Amino acid sequence: MHGLRLVCSIGTLPLVILAYPAASLHTTSAAVDLDSLRLTSNSEYVNSVHVDTNRSVAVSAEEHYTDTAARLVQNIVPGASFRLIDDHFVGDNGVAHVYFRQTLHGIDIDNADFNVNIGKDGLVLSFGHSFFTGALPSSHLDNTNVLSPEAALRGARDAIQLPLTIDNVSTEAAEGRNEYIFREAVGAVSDPKAKLVYLVKPEGTLALTWRIETDMYEHWLLTYIDAETTTVHGVVDYVADATYQVYPWGTNDPAEGHRTIVTDPWDLSASAYTWISDGRDNYTTTRGNNAIAHWNPTGGGSYLYNLRPSDPNLNFQWPYSPNMSPPRSYINASIVQLFYTANAYHDLLYTLGFTESAGNFQWNNSAHGGRDKDYVILNAQDGSGFSNANFATPPDGIPGRMRMYIWIESTPSRDGSFDAGIVIHEYTHGVSNRLTGGSHNAGCLSALESGGMGEGWGDFMATAIRIKPNDTRTTSYTMGAWADNDKCGVRDYPYSTSFTENPLNYTSVNTMNGVHAIGTVWATMLYEVLWNLIDKYGKNDGSRPVFRNGVPTDGKYLMMKLVVDGMALQPCNPNFVQARDAILDADIVLTGGKNRCEIWRGFAKRGLGQGAAHSSLNWMRRGSTLLPTGC
């Protein structure tokens, strides 16, 4: 996978650097630019303020929150056909999240989604949707011009230039209507799949398409190919870009501290089986309910029998120093560090609301909701690339997959598993993709702007976690500086509240066409709000939040909680304005809106104040530094 080159802009020192993977395809996987094929977003989000003042969306509370949500959908889009998606859940803040998919002639409109958030009082809190409201075509199913699923697979392979051999493929009907599985395809990790769906095109019309799913390992693609003409209308990529001797939680990389021995580091309230059991089997290696970590030198898709360190006494202690070479000489330490960081983050996220019912990553959900059998597959020293990392997020019930690489910008080279910020960034892709639009709809950050925010959430969470006891709002942080052997890191600017160090604002996005650049703007805004809340409530430097009445008592964990809750509230493929409003709504639910002004001031400082707007006509953004009345 090719990297995205950015310019480091700390002070006056321009420098070309290699960033985390962009959306362009690796030559062993395909040969086209995926960014040019991203789906566009046409979602709208109606926040809690507008719901309270708009009588047209008033819906009385029904016996079950899903019935209340369905009544709202009927009121907003009368006459539309839709189905309830079975990943609805009640978050730990008491808000119920319900998801619907629009249908036509019994077929899904794959990018027409409706999410409804029901408050603790049983009434609608907020909602978002991208339902199609234009002229509905007659059924195409009797049209003899509709491609066969085999022809659609061939068309997708040729259009995306996938290294997929399908000469001897056989086709089997799957459980769903107009769904098929292709057996004996060579070059994919798993059998490709096809499903007949409608797709809303950017110009606002519907197309009947075959959705071809191909897991090529480096890219896990949903290709929407016209069911009659083989034109590609869009692509979604699921890949975004005991005792343990480790760099402890909060130590971002070897430049920040030293390894230490931690004993039984799990949080039993989040990992009831510890990190080395799944409730059925106990392990003496880096495998458990939340993750399975191993060496993957070939870069292949198999993992169950890969090398992983083991000790019958559960002493996961192996030597490492940054001066060791080659990387193979410290692979056990690398695997243990990756396993530790991913598990520690799982436990923190659990306390912040990313639980089984919300779609988290666990092999055994213990009847707590959601779909299980989906721990995170952690590949240390993955041999498929260098100086990168990525995370594949399929729907709930299918394992996530993180690949960590060796970074070759230094001598000796450096192992990305020892840079906690990179691991946390990648894992956060799984969080934001599972929470936005529902855990069964992993394509809800597929538009350019929403995909950019996906990168930004990863950077923000990694940065918030590494904040030190003596840090203040004047403290700035880069991303990936140690791994990349560059003090500037892998982003255009450091995360800072200073316009001198980081001049980005909302309208900066107008000139950006890459998700990592857009994500830097979003994470910068979140960093501003973070320090406003820390200044108000102080900062908890422990590894877990302290709650009072369900609310973190400090500003750092409060902001992280609001970010996680906001992901669950926002619509599929949100823009900056909608995601900001979702965070404001999350604060209303959690604290009664006590932090309204601190949140507004942080966003307004960077141009996302009251009146800031995103045009769906020309995709341009109008900035504003205005604050609402009362702030």
Curated annotation (Swiss-Prot):
It comes from the Eukaryota. The active site is at E426. Its EC number is 3.4.24.-. InterPro entries: FTP_domain (IPR011096), Fungal_virulence_M36 (IPR050371), Peptidase_M36 (IPR001842), Peptidase_M4/M1_CTD_sf (IPR027268). Residues 1-19 form the signal peptide. Zn(2+) binds at H425, H429. Its main location: secreted. GO terms for biological process: proteolysis. Glycans are attached at N282, N332, N364, N470, N505. GO terms for cellular component: extracellular region. Binds 1 zinc ion per subunit. GO terms for molecular function: metalloendopeptidase activity; zinc ion binding. Keywords: Glycoprotein, Hydrolase, Metal-binding, Metalloprotease, Protease, Secreted, Signal, Zinc, Zymogen. Its cofactor is Zn(2+). Residues 20-241 form a propeptide. It is found in: Secreted. PANTHER family: EXTRACELLULAR METALLOPROTEINASE MEP. Secreted metalloproteinase that allows assimilation of proteinaceous substrates. Belongs to the peptidase M36 family. This is Extracellular metalloproteinase mep.
